[in-house]
UniProtKB/Swiss-Prot annotation:
Tissues/organs with expression: Component of the acid-insoluble and acid-soluble organic matrix of calcified layers of the shell (at protein level).
Source domain of life: Eukaryota
Organism from which the protein derives: Lottia gigantea (Giant owl limpet)
The protein's name: Glycine-rich protein
Compartment(s) where it occurs, according to its Swiss-Prot or TrEMBL record: Secreted
Keywords for this protein: Secreted, Signal
Any single Gene Ontology cellular-component annotation: extracellular region
Length: 145
C-alpha cells in the first residue's frame, strides 16, 4: 500500500488523538521499507488502547471494542497481504464481524463475484443459528440410555 497524503493525514489524525508518537509515525511513513513500516504502524495502532475504547477480549486483534475504522484498516491490510484475495482475508478474519460490504468496497469491487457467495453463506448460517431452539428446550434434551 503506497502511503498517499490522505493515508498520512489519517494516521497523523490518529496519532494526535490517540497519543501515538508522531515522530515514530513520521519515521514509518517515510520512503522505503513499505511492508515492514506498515506492520509497525498496525502494531502501534492495535497496541494503542484508545482505539475504539480498548480492544481485546473478543477474538484476537479485532476483539472487543475495536472501532470500525481500525477493522477497516486491518481488512485493507489483509486484502493487500493476500494479493487482493478476499477469501483468504475473510478466512483470516474469521468471526471478526467485518461487514462484507466494507470488504467489497475496500477491494475496489473487483472481487464482488468471490465475496457474494461468502456473504450468502454467512447469512444462511446466521438464520440457522437464530432458528435453533435454546439448549435444553423441549424436545432437544438428550435422555440417558
Amino acid at each position: 500500500m503506497k502511503l498517499t497524503l490522505a493515508v498520512v493525514v489519517v494516521f497523523a489524525y490518529i496519532a494526535t488523538t490517540n497519543a501515538i508518537n508522531p515522530a515514530i509515525l513520521a519515521a514509518m511513513t517515510g520512503g522505503g521499507g513499505g511492508n515492514f513500516k506498515q506492520m509497525l504502524l498496525m502494531d502501534a495502532l492495535f497496541k494503542n488502547q484508545n482505539i475504539g475504547g480498548g480492544g481485546g477480549g473478543g477474538g484476537g486483534v479485532l476483539g472487543g471494542g475495536q472501532s470500525q475504522f481500525a477493522k477497516m484498516i486491518m481488512t485493507k491490510m489483509l486484502l493487500k497481504q493476500f494479493g487482493e484475495n478476499p477469501l483468504a482475508a475473510m478466512t483470516l478474519m474469521g468471526n471478526q464481524n467485518i461487514d462484507p460490504m466494507t470488504l467489497i468496497a475496500l477491494s475496489g469491487g473487483e472481487n464482488m463475484q468471490a465475496i457474494i457467495p461468502i456473504i450468502m453463506r454467512q447469512q444462511m448460517q446466521q438464520q440457522m443459528r437464530s432458528q435453533m431452539p435454546p439448549v435444553g428446550a423441549l424436545g432437544t434434551q438428550m435422555t440417558p440410555m
